[in-house]
Amino acid sequence: MSAGHLRKRRYVKVGDIHDMGPILGGVHDVSSPPPNVHYQQQDDHNDPGCMIHYPGEGWFSSMSTVEKLMLGAVIVAAVVVGVRMFMSSGNSSATSSFSTAPYFMG
């Protein structure tokens, strides 16, 4: 009985925090259990600890333009290499920069 009573009280406590809706981003409903008890224990609404962080949210936005261009070039190069290797694996007569012909001809 005490566990159910505590759980009910916790939901009421979460339901009383109406002004945290924008901070939580509407990720969980008031009627559902909170994802973390950390939200109920926050007294300061400006504390970054009660904001929901999405995976990979901070590192990309903190990168400079040059770093973003370099990352894009690496991704494009990886895709091109992967596609060329995939295309040449099905065709034995395909000539590409990844061809192993010099090893067999020597």
From Swiss-Prot:
Membrane topology: Single-pass membrane protein
Protein name, per record: Uncharacterized protein 034R
Keywords noted in UniProt: Host membrane, Membrane, Transmembrane, Transmembrane helix
Ranges annotated as spanning the membrane: 69-88
Intracellular or extracellular location(s): Host membrane
GO CC terms: host cell membrane; membrane
